Amino acid sequence: MLKFLKYTVATLLCFVCIFELIVFGIITQKKNVFDSSYQNLIVDKYRILEETDDKKIIMISGSSSSFGLDQKMLEEETGYKVTNLGLHAGFGHLFHSELAKENIKEGDIVLLGYEYNWFNNFETLGQQLIMSGIDDNIDMYKHIPVNHWKDFVGYMFQYAAEKNAYVDASGIYSREAFQGEDGQMTWLRDYAMSDYFDYINDYGTISILNANDEVEITDTTAQYLSALKKYVEEREASIYFVSSPALYESVTCSIDDFLKLVELEENTIGIPYISDPRLYLFPIDLMSNALYHCNSEGEKVRTSLLIDDLRLCGAIPAEAVSQTVKDEKGETFALVDTLPKRFLHKPRTIKRVYGYNAEGREVLFTEGVDYVIDYERGTIRRTDSSSIPNYSGHRVVYHSGKFTWVNSPEFYNPDENGMFQLKVDYDYFVSEKELEALENKSAYLSENVRHKILNGEDITIALCGDSIGAGAATNGNGYFFYYLDETLEQYYNINVETLNFSMGGRSSDLLIEDLQSIIDMRPDVLMVEFGMNDHGGADGNSEERVTAYKNNIEKAVNVFQENNIDVILIGFFQQNMTWDVENMEATRLYNEVLKDIADRNKIYFADVYSVFEKVGNVKPLSRDVMADFIHHPNEWGHKLYLTSIIDVFNINGDMRPVDLPDYVYVE
């Protein structure tokens, strides 16, 4: 009997050893097989976490953070390194969460940005994705909880078959879509998720209700997250829940149910939930190819929201605010249903909320009846019974994520924004930076022009541009040339004569046509505003077209300088990227051409692109700032042009944002 037992034990030990060798061989016999795959990027993200000893933000989520987090922006605004573990939610939230434990240190911030199945999804792991993701990086298996080992052992031979049959991946769901050094998504997603309703069965829907139509967090989930909270806090780090971005059109429950989930989580688990999830319910034009995947614009908006959340809860310092108050007039919003939208500045007092009807008459709206303000978070939303136009009625017809502009009596695409946009006059406590003087860029102006302005003499400023310079889609006075005229006259107590040579639909060739006419008028300063119409189309960044644009601008600059006319070059912003003729690379390239010409000729370049980019992180430009959903700014949007131009007229060096009524301060 004893011999039999010894034999049995020896046999079992041999079997275990042989099996372990087989497992080891399966995992390590062929290295880096899945290196090109999307899921294998988890190895890079894990190594970044391992090696980052600086204070850091650890993002734990599924693919909503691989497709929706601008890590550079987050690092610059917070001062923390970012380790973004966000990848395929099919790994299981348990896996991402366990990986994060590898290197949580004092002062770190752990963010739980799980997608909306987290409340009942901490019991399973995705063996196929995890094993192919880890590949031959055996050390990562230590983060698989022991009670799940049997599942991975059982999957081993299927994994071996997949490994032998694997073909390299490419495209957006592959390693090539990401930056190796930090795991940042770099693949351009310049399209809207316009096919959602055509493929709703494939994309799915989002609801946070259980089978009984109740908001619930399972015991397993609550126990795990409570333990995770304790683990993080024992290491003197902070942990917060944050909302993931999600496609609003896919939501089948009430948006108030998301607030109930927030309350239930804080009461049950006790992790501070620092987001308003309603702000993260994005429209199709901010999403790309899945319910939780932002496009390139949505990624910026989501990151900006997250930064706001971190500031509001005190996790990172907020910008210093003074007790000085300034008015902001006419900031515009396009409001959908009862979803909130952020103000550019947190309002102190709402002065007036209004819009215009089809006849062009002003319509006033009432707080508490038509809209609700969250003064702490700085948001506005419609009420259920609001008479404010609902932007959900705005129509855009897309094809494959892009729209074609159509202007005919029978059909117009897309709808213009004017009828839907809400305008708000309010005041706010300015930041300390708004009390500081603007940078003095007046050296770009001639001594003669500076002398005239400082001595109260009349000056003449001319503008040659396209439809933006002509004030298209504005009320006639609400465009940047008018704002500049007003600002200079009020600030310096001078008379400014303006000459506008701009013409809708034209490109930089107009500048060449009007050379002599402009010279004959002898302006002191000429502002040149071209590029929006020059750069469009698939071949917009071709050498031939870029060279033609550059030659037109530079030839004109040289001629005007020879005639003692100061020149200012005005850049242009990123128009709606989902328009089928937009070329985002050309937008950046043409702005760089302008900057290069300005630098070489020692003239001022107004960086409109950067100002609009910063505002676009807070307010989706196409909805909230464009009058036509494409590229014509509304009256408030034109103030952003003034913001980019005015530094060159800060001649005495004393101009401050707080002193300029139409200047929009952008952090």
Q: Where do the model's predicted regions map?
A:
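Oxyanion-hole/transition-state-stabilizing segment in secreted/luminal serine hydrolases
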Residues: 104-131, 182-212, 462-464, 470, ...
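Secreted/periplasmic serine-hydrolase-like ester/acetyl group-modifying domain
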Residues: 127-235, 529, 660-667
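Solvent-exposed soluble domains appended to multi-pass membrane proteins
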Residues: 186, 190, 210-317
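Active-site segments of SGNH/GDSL-like serine hydrolases
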Residues: 228-254, 529-533, 556-591
